[in-house]
Curated annotation (Swiss-Prot):
Zinc finger (unnamed): 3-34
Entry cofactors: Zn(2+)
Biased composition (Polar residues): 1-11
Gene: nrdR
Cofactor note: Binds 1 zinc ion.
Function comment: Negatively regulates transcription of bacterial ribonucleotide reductase nrd genes and operons by binding to NrdR-boxes.
Residue ranges of the region described as Disordered: 1-20
Presence of the UniProt keyword Transferase in the record: no
ATP-cone domain: residues covered: 49-139
Protein name: Transcriptional repressor NrdR
Length: 161
């Protein structure tokens, strides 16, 4: 592993342990050259995914880009970072276990929106506004209407015969 401080390849693992849900290995490392300490995370990757962009271009799937876009939608929201990490891991697992090596950016966006809807309504609306390219206030109203209808649906009492 290359040291992020001096770029030396001579590093040692000092501590290695799984995270709470055992889906990631956290490793504490130290650079032998400059003594810089840093942490790395190791995840299982089920398959190499390629994203088909809207313009038809194909690019490798980037988990970090997914995490950044989710974090942007959650900016200034009080959501536990561990819940965000678990959500992103669940999205990646869903994509990797889908059976396809190529996935459209639209499909990724829809999956992210499903997960954000369960995590935080404001983040869901923020993400939807960028993903669906909102142009007018009525676009926001439509999404807010969907959320309101969804919130009210479980409150309806079941019909008994």
């Amino acid at each position: 592993m290359r040291c992020p401080s001096c770029n030396s390849l001579d590093t040692q693992v000092k501590d290695s342990r799984p995270t709470e849900d055992s889906s990631v290995i956290r490793r504490r490392r130290v650079c032998v050259t400059c003594n810089f300490r840093f942490t790395t995370f190791e995840r299982v990757q089920l398959r190499e995914l390629t994203v088909i962009k809207r313009n038809g271009r194909r690019v490798p799937f980037d988990r970090d880009k997914l995490m950044r876009s989710v974090q942007i939608s959650l900016r200034k929201r009080s959501v536990d970072p561990e819940r965000v990490e678990k959500m992103v891991s669940a999205i990646v697992r869903e994509l990797e276990s889908g059976g396809e090596s190529e996935v459209s950016s639209e499909a990724i966006g829809e999956i992210v929106m499903e997960h954000l809807r369960d995590l935080d309504d404001v983040a869901y609306v923020r993400f939807a506004s960028v993903y669906r390219n909102f142009r007018e206030a009525k676009d926001f109203e439509a999404v807010l209407g969907e959320l309101s209808a969804e919130d009210e649906a479980p409150r309806l009492a079941p019909v008994r015969k």
